[in-house]
Amino acid sequence: MARMPTMATRGNMEVKKIIETGDIFLGIEFGSTRIKAVLTDEKGEVLGIGIHDWENSFLDGIWTYPLDEILSGLSSCYASIKRDIKEKYGVTLKQIKYMGISAMMHGYMAFDKDMNLLAPFQTWRNSNTEEAAKDLSESFKFNIPLRWTIAHLYQRILDREEHVRNINFVTTLSSYIHYLLTGEKNIGIGDASGIFPIDSTAMNYDASMLDIFEEKIVEYKFPWKIREILPKVMVAGQRAGVLSKSGASLLDKDGDLQEGSILCPPEGDAGTGMVATNSIKKGTGNMSAGTSMFAMLVLDKKLNDYYEEIDMVTTPAGDPVAMSHANNGTSDLNAWVGLFREFSKLFGINISDGELFEKLYTNSLNGSPDCGNLMSFGYFSGEGITKLNEGRPLFLRSPKSEFNLANFMRAHLYSSLTAVKVGLDILTEKENVKIKKMMGHGGLFKTKGVGQRYLSAAINAPVEVLETASEGGAWGIALLALYVSQADKYSLDEFLSKKIFDKNTGSEIMADEKDVEGFKTFTQRYLNTVDIERLSVEKFAE
């Protein structure tokens, strides 16, 4: 069986000694709704977990997180794991040998020479870059998605925003936090691949595309060059900086944490998800299922063409990856579960969130394979795959639809996966990419056998979920921090296979043929009715 991610297999006294000597590895990941910290030993076994919940804000037409919430969230999450360690082992965290930062990819953070933020942080959820993304994609002959950092930067240029002239550094959330902790403007290659296209041979930004971009903006006569304002690209295993005194103070408001921890390259949540599911080998894939959804397939060759629906990114080791990404995942689903929670409280019934999700999800298995002609669009924001810049959560049924609770929940679960399926269908149908197996991780897979079965139906391939799956990227970035200490002995693939997942087995499910056909029917209905979603954006004001 897989190692349990929330409990070390050693005795408490032995763990206490390990913590006191500082031979431990910390990963912190900034997700969309939760900042999570995971502390491991040298075997990758989890010693403690810290959590800080947060939410993005929709201010002045953009999705953002204020800087003060980023900083307070960082220290709150660290305080949470510090308490967890103290309660479990009676020891105070003071030394941490290696650590790493991960965060949601893409978006736009632009700073001046004094590292003052020049414009509000725009997250990956913002799709207000249509003109820029289209122009760059045509110029590069490479798909530039709406949420990519270079699309945001170029859109600001096209809009002639005044702050652009004063830019000294443009980066992502993980790289910014890494800078706060170390003073180094570095980034992991996986996260960098969501800023600007990557050359997997050079392990750096694509030089020819940088030149094309420079030519496109020469008329503006900016005092900077694109190569000068992007973070330095680094690959897994490299030392990307050392925790400074000020960085330690940012993390630990009590002042107990010592400076000097070695940091791995900061990575994006896509890359840490690949690590956490041991899916960085060529031909393997993984699906991250949470408030956003993305499926990633590590390629053994380049694609023949480029597609708007497919992003080309990389593993933390730099290998090319095709990604089908959806901005919208389980947010609408979670909102409906919240409604059922409110209903139960109205009758004085107290049900834990875990039980509520488990009962509703499991009951959906009793629904029809095609969801009984029910349809859902859980669009809290725009969706690139269906070419929508805004979204409205929408539920549809006809008078003859099979309207019951099982089909209702099943439709929302299917819908959360369908946009990603549309992208994957392009790879399998137009590029003849074979999906041998998909590894699942994220909140959707916490209820055993439900999200896993539906994903298998969507892709018509086996889906495996490890016991570590719900820990996701925070554990993944902790493993990347651990890998820095092993990089002289193993490739990243070897390290994960031989040192971390050598005894791991997960649960694997292959959907029934009727579920596969049912999902195909649902997907076709989804595509046939997406214009109703488009009309709702036009007619139904926020």
Feature annotation, model-predicted:
Residues A2-P120, N166, R227, S249, ...:
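N-terminal glycine/serine-rich phosphate-binding loop of ATP-dependent small-molecule kinases
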Residues A8, N12-T21, L26-G27, L93, ...:
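Active-site core segments that coordinate phosphate-bearing ligands/cofactors
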Residues G48-I49, F222-Q238:
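Core alpha/beta catalytic barrel or barrel-like domain that forms the active/cofactor pocket
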Residues W63, S137-K141, I229:
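Short glycine/proline- and acidic residue-enriched helix-loop micro-motifs
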Residues K86-T123, N143-P145, H178-G190, G194-D199, ...:
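Short beta-strand-loop/turn "lid" adjacent to the catalytic site in phosphate-handling enzymes
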Residues N126:
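Carbohydrate-associated surface elements
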Residues T129:
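Gly/Ser-rich phosphate-binding catalytic loop and adjacent alpha/beta segment
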